[in-house]
Amino acid sequence: MKVLFDTNVWLDIILSRGGFWEASLTALYDCIDEDDDLCVIATSLKDVFFLVERLKDANVAYESVERMLELARPIAVDEAVCRRALPLERPDYEDGIIEAAAEIEQIECIVTRDDDAFRDLGIRRMSPLEFIKERGTEVVAL
């Protein structure tokens, strides 16, 4: 399955955000175990770097992006994606970019905690908890 993790899910995992990171990490483990085509929008890499550097430090930020690149295939944000995103997800152009890239890349599921994003998209969207429950996986208790 082609699965795209939204930026907030990556941040849950990397920053161990309370109340969210266990389900997000379990979803990641499940994608790895199932040999899914796990994807990340290229802009998420820079967003994660920026936030992790700010909250932790540059070394942790670089390690985080490197690990993301080991686990997920980056999806390019090119002119076609940028133009396609203009009418989508208003007023949030950033979500429009993710939506446009997901459509072009034929992503089957977007895993996100953003309840308002991607509602009108023809691609399934699920929270990390919904994703693992649907796949019959238990939340990893850490």
Predicted regions and their residues:
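Short, well-structured N-terminal submotif of metal-dependent ribonuclease cores
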Residues: 1-40, 53-60, 120, 129, ...
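Acidic, PIN/NYN-like endoribonuclease modules and their adjacent C-terminal/linker elements
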Residues: 2, 71, 100-142
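Alpha-helix capping/helix-boundary segments
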Residues: 9, 44, 81, 97-98, ...
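Acidic catalytic patch
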Residues: 16, 43-44, 64-89
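Structured helix-beta-strand junction loops
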Residues: 34-35, 71, 88, 121
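Glycine/small-residue-rich phosphate/adenosyl-binding loop
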Residues: 41-49, 53-69
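Glycine-rich anion/phosphate-binding loops
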Residues: 91-94
